[in-house]
Regions:
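Nucleotide-activated donor-binding/catalytic signature segment of Leloir-type glycosyltransferases, i.e.
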Residues: 237-265, 272
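Short hydrophobic beta-strand element within catalytic cores of glycosyltransferases
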Residues: 272-275, 294-304
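Donor nucleotide-sugar binding/catalytic pocket of nucleotide-sugar-dependent glycosyltransferases
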Residues: 39, 56, 135-185, 189-192, ...
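Membrane-proximal helix-turn-helix segments that form the acceptor-binding/catalytic region
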Residues: 74-82, 101-105, 129-150, 162
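Conserved donor-binding/catalytic core segment of Leloir-type glycosyltransferases
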Residues: 7-10, 193-220, 228, 349
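Nucleotide-sugar donor phosphate/pyrophosphate-binding loop at the beta->alpha transition
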Residues: 67-71, 108-109, 118-141, 208
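A short, well-ordered alpha-helix in the C-terminal region of glycosyltransferases
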Residues: 330, 337, 344-358
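Conserved acidic donor-binding segment of nucleotide-sugar-dependent glycosyltransferases
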Residues: 317, 321-328, 337-343
Length: 376
């Protein structure tokens, strides 16, 4: 029997909450590939649960900024030089320099997973000098790639056109968790009021222009609702301050990042999931966020903005409504109108449960395995 190629997958994020890299590593391991997943450990990271594949986490002095990215790539590069691997899998542009250079020296194959339109994220578009550095790296490295994939067809098409690289698509759909793996939580366990309709807003990267601020401001007009944020991100603390300053602490609560099983348990207790990304940059315009599929897997309807990839899923599977106006009163009105028709909510829930049978990792992972099997 031929031995499977050894794979090292590198990502700059926290391995505890990055579901995409976990799903990929798990599927590769189950397919017989020896897998080592390399990431980082923040000071506030949760303990890493037991996983069937090998894991290595780097601790660094810096947690953000140029020194952090430089230190991570240097550490990763030196680490990769000491390890045997046939395939090096770079997750996003911020690991690709180290991965590509190590692969060039060692003769390994490079596979690239672009989780987003990296150089168009607002954190970079608002800082043109930093963006220019990353864009130069992208222009230098991407044309050299032979094995690449991304999260949706819109982003794949942009990269194909710009760099002439045949990007495949592996969507960000979740694992189908067995019922016994999901904690048996109730609203009472979480101390949620029993007489409120609950809106959930997920995200490990709740950053600027994700619609979180608008959701909070809409709560001024929704006194019989509860808004639950689950996750973290660049604006998470600012959101807490805004809720406090507006006196909305009885209507808006914040939960930290959760393990996937706990996140699923919390999400399915909500009535509706919110996906309110704004079309303020190319990355958001063409995004297909994890939370959309997490809501569907949890069997709850979705209220989403009209960014193309999200709208396509919501309308194709009829799992929710599309809101076009995020001004506080307008958004609140849309939410109230949504709940004014119990039959519609019930239909959306039923459709979400049906869509979950198709929009899950068991179906999607075959695309990843095909890319790895035919890596050049």
């Amino acid at each position: 029997m031929t031995e499977k190629p050894r794979i090292i997958s590198a990502v700059i994020s926290d391995l505890v909450t990055d579901q995409r890299v976990h799903r990929a590593a798990l599927s590769l391991h189950e397919a017989g590939y020896p897998v080592l997943l390399v990431g980082r450990q923040r000071k506030a990271s949760l303990p890493l649960d037991q996983r069937p594949y090998a894991v290595r986490r780097f601790r660094l002095w810096w947690e953000k900024g140029p020194l952090f990215y430089a230190a991570f790539n240097l550490r990763l590069f030196l680490f990769l030089l000491t390890k045997k691997a046939d395939i090096l899998l770079a997750n996003d542009l911020d690991t690709l320099p180290a991965v590509w250079l190590a692969a060039f020296i060692k003769g390994s194959k490079v596979v690239y997973d672009s989780h987003e339109l990296f150089c168009e994220v607002p954190e970079l578009t608002h800082r043109p000098r930093t963006r220019n550095i990353w864009k130069r790296i992208e222009r230098f490295l991407l044309p050299k790639l032979r094995n690449a994939y991304t999260v949706n067809e819109s982003i794949a098409s942009i990269y194909r056109k710009e760099y002439g690289v045949d990007f495949k698509v592996v969507r960000n759909v979740p694992l189908r968790l067995p019922a016994q793996a999901i904690p048996a939580l109730t609203r009472a366990d979480l101390q949620w009021p029993g007489d409120r309709r609950v809106l959930v807003f997920q995200g490990t990267g709740i950053n600027v222009d994700r619609g979180a601020e608008e959701a909070i401001r809409a709560m001024e007009f929704l006194d019989d609702f509860l808004l639950v944020f689950v996750g973290g991100g660049d604006v998470y603390e600012q959101l807490r301050l805004e809720v406090s300053s507006k006196g909305l602490s009885d209507r808006v609560i914040f939960l930290p990042r959760q393990r996937p099983e706990t996140l699923r348990a919390i999400t399915r207790l909500a009535d509706v999931g919110l996906s309110l990304d704004k079309d303020t940059n190319l990355n958001y315009r063409y995004s297909l966020p994890n939370k959309l599929f997490d809501y569907i897997q949890a069997g709850i309807p979705v209220i989403a903005t009209s960014i193309p990839e999200v709208q396509r899923i919501v309308e194709q599977y009829r799992v929710g409504g599309i809101v076009s106006d995020l001004r506080p009163e307008a958004l609140a009105g849309f939410i109230r109108d949504t709940f004014s028709d119990p039959g519609r909510i019930r239909t959306w829930k039923e459709n979400a449960q049906l869509a979950a049978d198709e929009l899950n990792w068991d179906q999607e992972k075959t695309r990843l395995l095909d890319i790895i099997e035919h890596a050049r």
